[in-house]
Amino acid sequence: FISSNISNFGAKAFSVYGASKGAVDSLMRSLAVELAPRVRVNSVLPGGVRTAMTEHMYQDENLVNRIAAAYPLGLGEVKDIYMTVNFLLSDAARWVTGQQFTVDGGRTINITG
């Protein structure tokens, strides 16, 4: 599943989005138990990366700078997310199920930023 790091903290104007992603994570955990051992089920919780959904935010340089300041490792790219997904799809993750993988450049640990 692709969820969002927003499911792990509150964010102004994101209550419905955060709640829906929290539901995705809950479903993931239930399915991980129900489908084991035949199927592994996990969630990837990306931070904000440049996508079609966020493209409008990248038109404002001041906004981009404020967003980047909240990420200890700086802004991420889509490839940072798909590398985690590729790991989870590989045999290297054969003993991984029911887990949330937060891939957000440290944003979740820097909530005040």
What does each model-found stretch correspond to?
Residues S4:
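Residue(s) in the substrate-gating loop at a strand-loop-helix junction
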Residues R40-R50, L89, T102-D104:
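Conserved SDR Rossmann-fold cofactor-binding beta-strand/turn motif
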Residues A70-I81:
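A conserved structural motif in NAD(P)-dependent oxidoreductases
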Residues A32-P37:
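Alpha-helical segment proximal to the catalytic Tyr-Lys
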Residues F9-S15, D91:
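Active-site loop immediately N-terminal to the catalytic Tyr-X3-Lys motif
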Residues N8, L45-H56:
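Short, flexible catalytic-loop segment of classical short-chain dehydrogenase/reductase
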Residues S20, M28:
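Active-site helix of classical SDR
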Residues F9, N86, T97-G113:
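Short C-terminal tail/terminal secondary-structure segment
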